[in-house]
Swiss-Prot record:
One of its GO terms (biological process) is mRNA catabolic process. Gene3D superfamilies: 3.30.310.210, Hypothetical protein af1432 (1.10.3210.10). One of its GO terms (molecular function) is RNA endonuclease activity. This is Ribonuclease Y. Endoribonuclease that initiates mRNA decay. Belongs to the RNase Y family. InterPro entries: HD/PDEase_dom, HD_domain, HDIG_dom, KH_dom, KH_dom_type_1, KH_dom_type_1_sf, Ribonuclease_Y, RNase_Y_N. The chain crosses the membrane at residues 3-23. The keyword Transmembrane applies.
Length: 520
């Protein structure tokens, strides 16, 4: 039983092993076959893909070669065209050069021909010159034999005869031309001047050395005088103007040769009357304000004068100085009005003569600018004015017209300067325009003030009481009481030496020392 079982078991094992081996071989063959087929297929596909890529690469290479070939052919054609164009240009230039060479050769041939002709003519001329020279020598010898004079003597005689004849003729012609020119110039000048005078119609008021201020009541006179006269003394000291309070009802007369001082005094007095507070400290404050306001008015007056005449571009400082002329007089004639009149006359006459009208008006307006500062600077007003104009960038033509209008630095050399001189004479020579007596009086007062101002330590000097008194303000820090007395004597002595005058002149030297303290 067990043997059979064992036998069956062994048989089963053999049968199972054989079956397994058979099945294994069969399956292995199948797998191997599949793998071979797969490998063959992969190889085939790889071969096909490689061929496709090869074709694609070949195609791309062919395309690139084709494109490069096209580009090369295009570039070649372009360069061929450019070379063709350049070749044509070179041909044209070559043809032109050939033409030029031909023309140059022709000209050279012509020049050679002309040179030959000239050389022939030169030889002929030399021959003729020699013939003429020999003939002239023969004739000179014959003339010397006939006249008994040498060549030099004959030349000198002929020259003297021609010179005398020419001189006589030219002198005769010059006399005729000069007479004609003088007659024409005089007639034309009279026409131009008459024209200008008729066209100008400026108003004129004679200037005086006094100004009247109307008071609201008679009581105001006492307030102006103040206790023991301190207010009126403060007014006269601050303004340099003589305040005359007399029996004239409700009127105070201000007397001073300087119109600017009178104007400051008038403005200050009117403001004090309106304000009501009249005492020395207030007087000084108001006078300072009035001086500042007058400086503004002076500039405005100068600007208005330039606007009225139509002159622009003048330096602001010259405009300010021009405004000061409104407060200066020359033989009672207001200098600013005189300058405006001269500018107008200059412009009118310049238009007749064809001279620059704007320059003529400018020179006429500025011709007396030096009179605004001639009391501060030594010298003639014409020379001072020329220096001012030059300082503030006026042209040489304007400067010359200013300095030459009184011929102090030579005669006028330009038409503009002559116009200014003529217009100045016309404006000043009108009947009633100027009064000699008042001008000499004003100059005497100016001289008095200048004498006092020459001394060291003098701050201000005023000539008042019609020149019968000089009030001198000195600096308290630089001059003591004893020196004040000596200064007074020195000024009086200098006036006696320098001036001739009737009666006597009182010299008052004022030294004021102030001490100011504040209670806190």
């Amino acid at each position: 039983m067990s043997f059979i079982l064992v036998l069956c078991t062994v048989s089963s094992l053999f049968v199972g092993g054989g079956t397994g081996i058979f099945l294994y071989k069969k399956v292995s063959k199948k797998y191997i076959g599949d793998a071979k087929e797969l490998a063959i297929r992969i190889v085939e596909e790889a071969r096909k893909e490689g061929q496709a890529q090869k074709k694609e690469i070949l195609l791309q290479g062919q395309n690139e070669i084709f494109n490069q070939k096209k580009e090369f052919e295009f570039d070649f054609k372009q360069r061929e065209k450019e070379l063709s164009i350049k070749d044509k240009k070179l041909q044209v230039q070559s043809e032109r050069l050939e033409e030029r060479l031909e023309r140059a050769a022709e000209k050279e041939h012509e020049i050679l021909k002309v040179e030959k002709e000239l050389s022939i003519k030169e030889r002929n001329l030399l021959t003729l010159e020699e013939q003429l020279k020999s003939r002239i020598d023969e004739q000179e010898k014959q003339l010397q034999k006939i006249s008994g004079l040498t060549v030099e003597e004959a030349k000198q005689s002929l020259f003297e005869e021609v010179k005398n004849r020419s001189r006589h003729e030219s002198a005769k012609m010059m006399r005729l031309i000069e007479a004609e020119a003088v007659e024409t110039a005089n007639r034309k000048a009279k026409e131009i001047i008459a024209n200008a005078i008729q066209r100008y119609a400026g108003d004129y008021v004679s200037e005086h050395t006094v100004t009247a201020v109307t008071l609201p009541s008679e009581d105001m006179k006492g307030r102006i005088i103040g206790r023991e006269g301190r207010n009126i003394r403060a007014l006269e000291s601050a303004t340099g103007v003589d305040f005359i309070i007399d029996d004239t009802p409700e009127t105070v007369v201000l007397s001073a040769y300087s119109p600017m001082r009178r104007q400051v005094a008038k403005m200050a007095l009117e403001r004090l009357i309106q304000d009501g507070r009249i005492h020395p400290a207030r007087i000084e404050e108001i006078v300072r304000k009035c001086e500042e306001d007058l400086a503004i008015q002076v500039r405005e007056i100068g600007e208005q004068a330039t606007f009225d005449i139509g002159v622009y571009g003048i330096h602001p400082e010259l405009i300010r100085i021009l405004g000061q002329l409104n407060y200066r007089t020359s033989y009672t004639q207001n200098v600013l009005r005189h300058s405006i009149e001269v500018a107008s006359l200059c412009g009118m006459m310049a238009a007749e003569l064809g001279v620059d009208i704007k320059k003529a008006k400018r020179a006429g307006l500025l011709h007396d600018i030096g009179k605004a500062v001639d009391h501060e600077v030594e010298g003639s007003h014409a020379i001072i004015g020329a220096e001012l104009a030059k300082k503030f960038n006026e042209t040489e033509e304007i400067v010359h017209a200013i300095e030459a209008h009184h011929e102090e630095k030579g005669k006028p050399e330009t038409a503009l300067a002559i116009l200014v001189q003529a217009s100045d004479c016309l404006s000043g020579a009108r009947p009633g325009a100027r009064l000699e007596l008042l001008e000499s009086y004003v100059k005497r007062l100016e001289h008095l003030e200048n004498i006092a101002g020459e001394f060291e330590g003098v701050s201000k000097a005023y000539a008042i009481q019609a020149g019968r008194e000089v009030r001198v303000m000195v600096d308290a820090d630089s001059i003591g009481d004893d020196q004040t007395y000596l200064l007074c004597k020195d000024i009086a002595g200098r006036i006696e030496e320098s001036l001739t005058y009737p009666g006597q002149i009182r010299v008052t030297v004022i030294r004021e020392h102030r001490a100011v303290g504040y209670a806190k």
